């Protein structure tokens, strides 16, 4: 079996002001996998012998872009982002087997030497386009409210209903900071 994988990413960020920035990123992940299985002729389990070859190629590319800001006013902090993502994934697979028939020439282990070659080829590609936003509010670095929203559009779904929205709300309180003066000294 042989597997070759290539993964990489690059991010660029530009600060427009001390509180406003833009950022872009590109990420790629991909691999190629190949393997061959051979049962030679004359083996007790399968005297006719058999052979299988398999190869798969996978690639995923992501492009991310956003604009964001972080600002503080007295006891308050505010941060927000607005961005998007484009994802493209490609899968290719090729499979060849002997169909349970013997080799033409004994000892020649090649798919071209199969008396009954059966192959399967598969290809799939899909895309996901997304937009998202976040808003973060803080008070005295103790109470935090986080709002998020994301919408994805999937190429593999019916165009009339291929959109999904994911909202979230989080509220947290660091009570130990609020009651710091009244906490025991353990």
Residue ranges of predicted features:
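Outer-membrane beta-barrel translocator/channel fold
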Residues: 178-186
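Extended hydrophobic secondary-structure segments that form protein cores and membrane-embedded regions
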Residues: 79-85
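Surface-exposed loop/turn segments flanking beta-strands in extracellular/periplasmic regions
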Residues: 1, 36-51, 92-119
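Surface-exposed extracellular loop regions of Gram-negative outer-membrane beta-barrel proteins
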Residues: 4-73, 77, 126-177
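Sparse recognition of residues in long alpha-helices and their boundaries
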Residues: 40, 98, 163, 184-185
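A generic secondary-structure boundary signal that marks alpha-helix termini
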Residues: 91, 177-178
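Conserved "boundary/linchpin" sites in short secondary-structure elements
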Residues: 87-89
């Amino acid at each position: 079996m042989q597997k070759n994988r290539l993964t990489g990413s690059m991010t660029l960020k530009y600060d427009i002001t001390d509180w406003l920035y833009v950022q872009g990123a590109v990420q790629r992940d991909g691999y190629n996998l190949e393997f061959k299985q051979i049962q030679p002729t004359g083996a007790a389990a399968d005297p006719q012998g058999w052979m299988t070859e398999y190869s798969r190629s996978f690639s995923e590319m992501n492009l991310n872009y956003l604009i964001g800001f972080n600002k503080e006013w007295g006891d308050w902090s505010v941060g927000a982002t607005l961005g998007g993502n484009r994802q493209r994934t490609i899968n290719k697979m090729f499979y060849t087997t002997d169909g349970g028939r013997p080799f033409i020439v004994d000892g020649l282990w090649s798919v071209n030497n199969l008396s009954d070659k059966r192959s399967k080829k598969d290809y799939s590609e899909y895309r996901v386009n997304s937009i998202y936003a976040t808003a973060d509010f803080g008070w005295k670095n103790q109470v935090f409210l986080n709002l998020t929203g994301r919408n994805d559009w999937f190429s593999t779904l019916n165009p009339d209903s291929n959109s999904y929205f994911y909202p979230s709300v989080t509220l947290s309180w660091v009570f130990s900071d609020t009651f710091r003066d009244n906490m025991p000294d353990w």
